[in-house]
Amino acid sequence: VPAAAGIPLTHRGLARGFSVVSAHEDLIATVPVRRDHTLVLLMGVHHLRRSTAILTDRGADSETPAAVVERGYQPDQRVTTTRLRCLPDVAESVGVRAPAVIVLGDVVTVSPAWRHRLVPGE
């Protein structure tokens, strides 16, 4: 699904690896939180605030690029991009709904949707 939004999971100079996990606290608590690692969260729309808190508490950079890909590969696909620190509020303000995949990492900046990111104050 990230590919539907033009987001590669790895990219030279941006990400050397990736993890794909469901957005359960015990799984989020074990994934790498490095700038050179892409994180894909499944079934995470209803847990965005908690997931964001866990990741930042573990040392994830709050400025990490983030994308939510709703209804990937469907005619009504929507991609919302922002920064990790803004993700829960932006998702709420635009009405993000499942099914959706959340992508966290510098690879999000490769997506054409990054030009239209929603970051208050930026």
Give names to the regions the model predicted.
Residues V1-V21:
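Catalytic cores of RNA-modifying enzymes
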Residues A15-G17, S22-E122:
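A contiguous loop/helix-start segment that scaffolds small-molecule binding in enzyme catalytic cores
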